[in-house]
Structure formats: structure tokens, C-alpha cells
Amino acid sequence: DLVSWNLYLGWYVPGLFLNDLWMDFFHLVYPNRPLGFSEYGAEGMPNLHSAHPRRGDHTEEYQAKYHEYMLKCFDRHPWLWATHVWNMFDFAADARDQGGEPGMNHKGLVTFDRKTKKDSFYLYKAWWSEENFVHICSKRFTDRTEKEIEVKVYSNQKSVTLYADGKKLAE
């Protein structure tokens, strides 16, 4: 027998680290039972942003932070038999009223209209695709108040170099 769980630790329940604890405990108690994640995800809206993303804020940045953690968490638990991100696309959900848009679930990696790929989409592309690419994260986050910002990219390349005004800033 095998089992998969729908868990949203770090989204509905505070604490991304709880995913590691839960998986380790399950494996300790049931060392011979294959474990999978049949649903995991966090809502992210490409029009909501934060320099300090936090659980439940529906920002594109928190959704990316959540998925970054989960992919690394899955790597730390090689005995998982399957993981299933929830969901490829945002979708209608009549009874929902979260994130400022009633009737929608924004856990997708791509918007409901299939037009906008969220930053989290490119995280998975970096992990899984062989197509060469670089994606600059938070590029829709234009109304900022910080003096300095961190530039984050997702890429499947060995290295990426950042230039601004012809000057090399980072590699």
C-alpha cells in the first residue's frame, strides 16, 4: 500500500518547517509505507507584492517562497514516491472569498486566463526543463519603497550575471 496526503503546512497552517517534521515523523512511524504529497501549494496573485512576504498575504513573492521551500524539502526526503503541485492554473471556486477576488482559487502557477505565468511557474521550469532560460522574479513588483532590492532569478544555467547600466553587479 501507499499513501498521499493533501497538506498545506506553511499556507493554511503557519510554519513551512512543519513539512519536514511531518514527513520525518511519518517515515519514522511507517518506514515501509510509500509517502506522497497529492496536493500542496500557496495562493499567489501577480498583482499583489511584498518586499517581506508572509503566509496568507496572497503575494506572488510568498507563493514563490513557499514553492522554493517545498522543492528543497522534497529533495531532503528522497523516499517520497510522488508530489503533485496544486495547481497548474488558477481556477474558479464558488465558495471562496480570499485574496480579494471572490470565487477564485489562486494556487495556480499560471493565471486563470492562461496568460500570465507566475514566478513560481519559472521555479519549476528551472528544476525540470532542459530549455535554456533565465527569469527575473518580481518584475511586476514596480511600486517599491526600499532603497535597495534583492534581485532574484530562476534559471537552469550554471551561472547568471547581473548587469545594470553596463556595469557588472553580481554573478
Predicted ranges, named:
Residues 1-171:
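Extended substrate-binding grooves/exosites of carbohydrate-active enzymes
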